[in-house]
């Protein structure tokens, strides 16, 4: 039996693609139902995080689909109504500093890719250092976008601290949009959720 919720397989996403009206949503509903039905009584029940881009799964008219997935409307997360009840940042409590260093590079690249603006190597490196410093301040607990921007600003030359650059612009957008909670309030591994987009 394949443990899709374990950490042995690092990338267990499923992609369903097709043209408009080809039945992608229905196929996805059938697949999720089959996967959940076959695994729910096993030692490795398959849970999911579904990003509902078209609003079909979160539409009250399609509540029957929720029953197929063995969830109810409380599993629908709407970031427009309230922040997603989890943090996008890892908890590195008790972990090696090098893990944070590697993560900071990955996270800096991810943040930089949000906006198409030109970002210099210096800005990217400064962001990575800011993430490391934010983790030091939080004692390796999950950081926040506010904490990262404060550390980023502190690393800027004095003359540039009051100015926005591409990195600060992206971070300010993330802060203003308030998409995520500052701590995990749900378990994304043990439960299934639909994120209304």
Where does each model-flagged region fall?
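Basic- and hydrophobic-enriched, low-structure N-terminal and domain-boundary segments
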Residues: 1-22, 26-27, 31-42
């Amino acid at each position: 039996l394949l443990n899709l919720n374990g950490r042995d397989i690092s990338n267990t996403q499923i992609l369903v693609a097709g043209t408009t009206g080809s039945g992608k949503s229905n196929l996805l509903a059938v697949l999720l139902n089959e996967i959940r039905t076959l695994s729910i009584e096993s030692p490795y029940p398959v849970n999911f995080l579904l990003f509902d881009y078209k609003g079909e799964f979160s539409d009250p008219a399609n509540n029957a689909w929720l029953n197929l997935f063995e969830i109810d409307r409380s599993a629908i997360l709407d970031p427009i109504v309230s922040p997603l009840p989890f943090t996008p940042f890892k908890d590195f409590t008790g972990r090696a500093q090098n893990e944070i260093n590697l993560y900071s590079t990955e996270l800096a690249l991810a943040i930089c890719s949000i906006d198409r603006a030109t970002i210099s190597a210096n800005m990217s490196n400064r962001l990575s250092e800011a993430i490391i410093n934010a983790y030091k301040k939080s004692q390796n607990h999950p950081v926040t976008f506010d904490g990262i921007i404060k550390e980023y600003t502190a690393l800027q030359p004095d003359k540039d601290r009051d100015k926005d650059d591409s990195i600060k612009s992206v971070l300010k957008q993330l802060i203003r949009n308030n998409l995520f909670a500052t701590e995990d309030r749900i378990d994304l591994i043990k439960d299934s959720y639909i994120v209304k987009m």
